[in-house]
Amino acid sequence: MDSTALKVALGCIAIRLAVNSLFPSLQQQLDQSVEFSTPVTSFRSLQEGIYLLRNNIQVYNHGVVHHPPILIFFLSLFNSDRLISLIYALIDGLIAYQLTEVTKAFKNLKLKVWLPGLLYAVNPLTLLSCISRSSIIFTNFAISSSLYCILAEGNVLLSSVMISISGYLSVYPILLLIPLLGMLKSWRQRILSAIVSILSLLILLLFSYSILGSQSWSFLTQVYGSIITFEKVFPNLGLWWYFFIEMFDTFIPFFKAVFNIFIAVFITPFTLRYHKQPFYAFILCIGWIVLTKPYPSLGDAGFFFSFLPFFTPLFGYLRYPIISALLFLHAIVLAPIFYHLWVVLGSGNSNFFYAISLVYALAIASILVDLNWAMLRIEYDNGIPNFKLKVTQI
């Protein structure tokens, strides 16, 4: 085990445990924040599912729990609040470790191996997401594990299994199977990876059924159907909620289908266009899902930002990094203020909060556009950076 990666992981764990100890009430405050908690990732909802499962009560008949059965079953094994905090810290530490190990696969970048892992460890967004005990951390862990398995260990099968787990936990990450297949060298590996992913997902669903026993397949509707159909129109940092508050009921099913197609439709073009740089296509796909998913949180953005150091050789091509950074800072500072004005004080309205969520989306979108431009420029320059050359976008 590499000492650098281990130090980063231990530092990440220590920071999270220290914050938990110093600010014991912070978890509940963050869990009530729409920036870090959504109806499908909330720890309150997870606790409700754990309670119902332990008491042999039907978990998914009350419209409150939207977490997958295996996750609920896993966390129900631990009774201590401190132990659960430790589990979340360990998961975050493992993500930091994996990011550090993945960096070693890109020695030609001349990137400090500890930088992505350290950025993840000290990033306030990932730190607070972990403290809030949002279940998004498990999805992020599955995604980082998939990259770690294929890039650091060369294990295609395990990487495919981890992508299936991420899809099992949050639906949309299963789309990352497409750029994952683009990272494989032969069609034989791609077909095998796709088969393993599908079989793994089926096994996870069957195991979920066995956990619930007589409750049959009701979890499919509450866990996955509620996300795809955006069942709970709840304010968040995403683009969906305001549209479906204002929209006539007649048009809602059609536009929900359109929004879902919109998430999926750009994954394959990213993969095909950047087939020579499949890892970067994978990162862009992560960013696209973060931008377009129905229930995003700042934990999603923090995870995506941890991969930005891999674009270091392209930073000279970025056209408006300062604008993107200021947009993002503007959004994360004003989002809780505008939500408080709207919901708590009643001196604002939903337009306040949705306006700032649009700024947040614009920040993520501008980062994605800038990264795409940078990748096209390095390709135009035949892999040799030429920052002085001025090229006009047509």
From Swiss-Prot:
<dbReference type="GO" id="GO:0031505">
    <property type="term" value="P:fungal-type cell wall organization"/>
</dbReference>
<feature type="transmembrane region" description="Helical">
    <location>
        <begin position="191"/>
        <end position="211"/>
    </location>
</feature>
<feature type="topological domain" description="Lumenal">
    <location>
        <begin position="272"/>
        <end position="297"/>
    </location>
</feature>
<keyword id="KW-0256">Endoplasmic reticulum</keyword>
<keyword id="KW-0131">Cell cycle</keyword>
<protein>
    <recommendedName>
        <fullName>GPI transamidase component GAB1</fullName>
    </recommendedName>
</protein>
<dbReference type="GO" id="GO:0051301">
    <property type="term" value="P:cell division"/>
</dbReference>
<comment type="subunit">
    <text>Forms a complex with GPI16, GPI17, GPI8 and GAA1.</text>
</comment>
<feature type="topological domain" description="Lumenal">
    <location>
        <begin position="346"/>
        <end position="351"/>
    </location>
</feature>
<comment type="function">
    <text>Component of the GPI transamidase complex. May be involved in the recognition of either the GPI attachment signal or the lipid portion of GPI.</text>
</comment>
<feature type="topological domain" description="Cytoplasmic">
    <location>
        <begin position="182"/>
        <end position="190"/>
    </location>
</feature>
<keyword id="KW-0132">Cell division</keyword>
<feature type="transmembrane region" description="Helical">
    <location>
        <begin position="225"/>
        <end position="245"/>
    </location>
</feature>
<dbReference type="GO" id="GO:0005783">
    <property type="term" value="C:endoplasmic reticulum"/>
</dbReference>
<feature type="transmembrane region" description="Helical">
    <location>
        <begin position="161"/>
        <end position="181"/>
    </location>
</feature>
<feature type="topological domain" description="Cytoplasmic">
    <location>
        <begin position="1"/>
        <end position="135"/>
    </location>
</feature>
<comment type="pathway">
    <text>Glycolipid biosynthesis; glycosylphosphatidylinositol-anchor biosynthesis.</text>
</comment>
<dbReference type="Pfam" id="PF06728">
    <property type="entry name" value="PIG-U"/>
</dbReference>
<keyword id="KW-0472">Membrane</keyword>
<feature type="topological domain" description="Cytoplasmic">
    <location>
        <begin position="373"/>
        <end position="394"/>
    </location>
</feature>
<feature type="topological domain" description="Cytoplasmic">
    <location>
        <begin position="319"/>
        <end position="324"/>
    </location>
</feature>
<feature type="region of interest" description="May be involved in recognition of long-chain fatty acids in GPI">
    <location>
        <begin position="235"/>
        <end position="255"/>
    </location>
</feature>
<feature type="transmembrane region" description="Helical">
    <location>
        <begin position="251"/>
        <end position="271"/>
    </location>
</feature>
<dbReference type="GO" id="GO:0006506">
    <property type="term" value="P:GPI anchor biosynthetic process"/>
</dbReference>
<dbReference type="GO" id="GO:0042765">
    <property type="term" value="C:GPI-anchor transamidase complex"/>
</dbReference>
<dbReference type="GO" id="GO:0005789">
    <property type="term" value="C:endoplasmic reticulum membrane"/>
</dbReference>
<feature type="topological domain" description="Cytoplasmic">
    <location>
        <begin position="246"/>
        <end position="250"/>
    </location>
</feature>
<dbReference type="GO" id="GO:0016255">
    <property type="term" value="P:attachment of GPI anchor to protein"/>
</dbReference>
<feature type="topological domain" description="Lumenal">
    <location>
        <begin position="157"/>
        <end position="160"/>
    </location>
</feature>
<feature type="transmembrane region" description="Helical">
    <location>
        <begin position="325"/>
        <end position="345"/>
    </location>
</feature>
<keyword id="KW-0337">GPI-anchor biosynthesis</keyword>
<dbReference type="InterPro" id="IPR009600">
    <property type="entry name" value="PIG-U"/>
</dbReference>
<feature type="transmembrane region" description="Helical">
    <location>
        <begin position="352"/>
        <end position="372"/>
    </location>
</feature>
<keyword id="KW-1133">Transmembrane helix</keyword>
<keyword id="KW-0812">Transmembrane</keyword>
<feature type="topological domain" description="Lumenal">
    <location>
        <begin position="212"/>
        <end position="224"/>
    </location>
</feature>
<feature type="transmembrane region" description="Helical">
    <location>
        <begin position="136"/>
        <end position="156"/>
    </location>
</feature>
<feature type="transmembrane region" description="Helical">
    <location>
        <begin position="298"/>
        <end position="318"/>
    </location>
</feature>
<comment type="similarity">
    <text>Belongs to the PIGU family.</text>
</comment>
